[in-house]
């Protein structure tokens, strides 16, 4: 399929985010990603993601599905989205969720995996304990461990749907193309969701959101539990955590791929007649969200 590209006045800015840096302490990264879970909940992201995944699963033949999420952080909106799907859309199907990350949070891994035998929702969620690079072949990484997650998926007969929620903007164009290519080669659906479509604020004004983001970070910190004494100290007495939250949130819009830039990435992939890509925007509570869907045809 051919896609027409459009040129932008100001291209995407690949600024750094604190949580991406190898020198970022794990406890700061884990706290910031836990705060992001709260933000997703407030903005209604689990509902949006559940609706979109439900539409994709409805078009697929099969009785069992596994959603493999990359760049999961502390879980993001997927666990709550899965709960909505199981309650409303997929009662006649088995749906599981496998969370993965380059730097799996120890607290998140323990929280999800220790509850695997507690209730229908908890038993449907697992966090892959080893580092997983979203830019490398996904199924190969899952199958490299003894009794790996990939092997269990094959034995289970599950159809795989990939997701990347609020993580695509972390990838440079070369990395982003690898994620798209692996999904296309594997002929597995891929759903990419971003909190913004990259148009608000204008890219050259990305920095104006730093002060309100900092105040917002203080507010979000109050509702992010559980919390340690150290996290409280560095949230309110020495507010390093809200500062990191503010910076990462401000540069997200500047890093987010706009529609034309996404289709530029598609142009780098081998032509395929049996896999299609779609970019669309979804109305949000504050700004428009962007949604990228790849699927076999």
Regions found by a protein language model. Name each.
Residues 1-69, 74-76:
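Class I SAM-dependent methyltransferase Rossmann-like catalytic core
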Residues 65-143, 148:
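Class I SAM-dependent methyltransferase SAM/SAH-binding core
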Residues 167:
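Hydrophobic adenine-recognition pocket in adenosine-nucleotide-binding enzymes
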Residues 183-200:
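Conserved beta-strand signature within the Rossmann-like core of class I S-adenosyl-L-methionine
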Residues 203-266, 272, 278:
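C-terminal alpha-helical "lid/dimerization" subdomain adjacent to the S-adenosyl-L-methionine
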Residues 267-297:
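C-terminal lobe and adjacent flexible extensions of AdoMet/dcAdoMet transferase-like proteins
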């Amino acid at each position: 399929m051919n896609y027409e590209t459009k040129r932008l006045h100001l291209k995407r800015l690949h600024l750094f985010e604190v949580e991406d840096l190898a020198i970022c302490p794990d406890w700061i990264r884990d706290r910031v990603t836990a705060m992001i879970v709260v933000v997703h909940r407030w903005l209604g992201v689990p509902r949006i993601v559940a609706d979109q995944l439900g539409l994709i699963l409805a078009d697929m033949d099969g009785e069992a599905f596994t959603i493999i999420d990359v760049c999961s952080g502390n879980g993001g909106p997927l666990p709550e989205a899965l709960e909505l799907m199981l309650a409303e859309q997929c009662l006649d199907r088995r749906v599981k969720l496998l969370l993965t990350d380059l730097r799996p949070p120890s607290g998140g891994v323990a929280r999800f995996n220790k509850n695997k035998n507690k209730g229908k929702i908890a038993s449907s969620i697992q966090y892959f304990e080893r580092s997983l690079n979203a830019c490398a072949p996904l199924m190969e990484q899952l199958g490299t461990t003894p009794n790996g997650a990939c092997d269990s998926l094959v034995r289970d007969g599950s159809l795989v749907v990939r997701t990347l929620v609020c993580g695509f903007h972390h990838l440079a164009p070369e990395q982003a193309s690898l994620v798209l290519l692996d999904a296309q080669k594997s002929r597995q659906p891929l759903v990419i969701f971003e909190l913004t479509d990259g148009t608000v604020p204008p890219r050259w004004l990305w920095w104006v959101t730093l002060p309100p983001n900092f105040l917002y970070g203080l507010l979000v910190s109050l509702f992010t539990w559980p919390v340690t004494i150290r996290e409280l100290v560095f949230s309110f007495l020495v507010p390093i955590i809200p500062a990191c939250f503010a910076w990462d949130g401000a540069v997200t819009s500047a890093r987010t791929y706009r529609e034309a830039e996404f289709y530029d990435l598609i142009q780098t992939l081998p032509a395929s007649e049996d896999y299609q890509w779609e970019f669309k925007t979804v109305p949000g509570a504050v700004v428009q969200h962007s949604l990228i869907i790849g699927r076999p045809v």
